[in-house]
C-alpha cells in the first residue's frame, strides 16, 4: 500500500514529523506535529520512493533525514547538510550506542561507515525496495532483531546483536507507539518502527509504560 500524498515516517516525543512526498511533488519536509510549522523543506523531482529520519550518529543532537529522491542527509532542525553516509531504506537499533544503524536488504551498516552484518544466503523483499521481513525488539533488550527470508524462500532467519550495551531501558515492545508501529510495519507501507520517546544523545529516562504482559 503506497500513500498518494504524504506519509509521516517518523515521530519523536517533541512532536516532529517527517513526511516524504510521492508522485509528482517529490522531496520531503519536517514539520511540527501539533502546529504544522515547517522546519525543513527539501524539494525533489519525481516519486520519492523511500525516506527515513533518525539519530544515526552517537554525536547527533538533532535527527538527520535522507530520501531516495534527494541525495545526502540533512539536519532535521536546520536543513543543513550532514556528513553521515546516506541511507534511505530502513533503520535498526543494533550495536551498543543509542543511535540507529542503517539496514538495507540483508545488511546492516553504520552511518559513519563499516558493515556490522552481512547475512549471506538471505534476501530483502518487495523488489527494489529491498526491505527486511521484519525489524523489531523481539527478544526484550531494546536493540532490535532482524528477520530475513532465505533466498531460497524455504526458511526465515532471526538475527540478533551480540554487542553489550550500558544503556538500560525496558523492551521497546512495552512502548505502545512502538508496538503499534511494528504491527503497521507488516500491514501498511513497510517502514521501520519508532518509539514514542527519544532514544539518542541526551535522552532522558523513558516514561513508565502502561503495557503489562502476562
Locate each region found by the language model.
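Extracytoplasmic/lumenal domain signature
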Residues: 1-214
Amino acid at each position: 500500500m503506497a500513500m498518494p500524498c504524504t506519509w509521516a515516517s517518523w515521530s519523536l516525543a517533541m512532536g516532529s514529523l517527517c513526511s516524504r512526498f510521492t508522485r509528482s511533488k517529490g522531496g520531503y519536509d519536517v514539520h511540527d506535529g501539533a502546529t504544522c510549522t515547517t522546519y525543513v523543506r527539501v524539494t525533489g523531482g519525481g516519486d520519492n520512493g523511500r525516506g527515513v529520519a533518525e539519530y544515526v550518529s552517537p554525536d547527533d543532537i538533532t535527527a538527520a533525514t535522507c530520501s531516495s529522491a534527494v541525495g545526502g542527509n540533512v539536519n532535521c532542525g536546520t536543513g543543513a547538510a550532514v556528513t553521515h553516509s546516506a541511507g534511505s531504506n530502513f533503520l535498526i537499533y543494533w550495536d551498543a550506542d543509542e543511535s540507529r544503524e542503517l539496514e538495507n536488504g540483508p545488511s546492516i551498516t553504520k552511518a559513519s561507515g563499516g558493515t556490522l552484518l552481512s547475512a549471506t544466503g538471505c534476501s530483502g523483499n518487495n523488489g527494489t525496495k529491498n526491505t527486511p521481513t521484519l525489524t523489531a525488539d523481539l527478544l526484550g533488550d531494546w536493540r532490535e532483531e532482524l528477520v530475513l527470508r532465505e533466498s531460497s524462500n524455504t526458511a526465515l532467519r532471526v538475527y540478533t546483536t551480540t554487542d553489550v550495551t550500558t544503556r538500560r531501558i525496558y523492551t521497546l515492545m512495552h512502548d505502545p507507539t512502538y508496538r503499534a508501529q511494528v504491527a503497521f510495519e507488516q500491514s501498511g507501507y513497510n517502514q521501520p518502527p519508532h518509539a514514542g520517546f527519544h532514544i539518542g544523545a541526551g535522552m532522558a529516562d523513558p516514561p513508565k509504560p502502561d503495557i503489562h504482559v502476562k
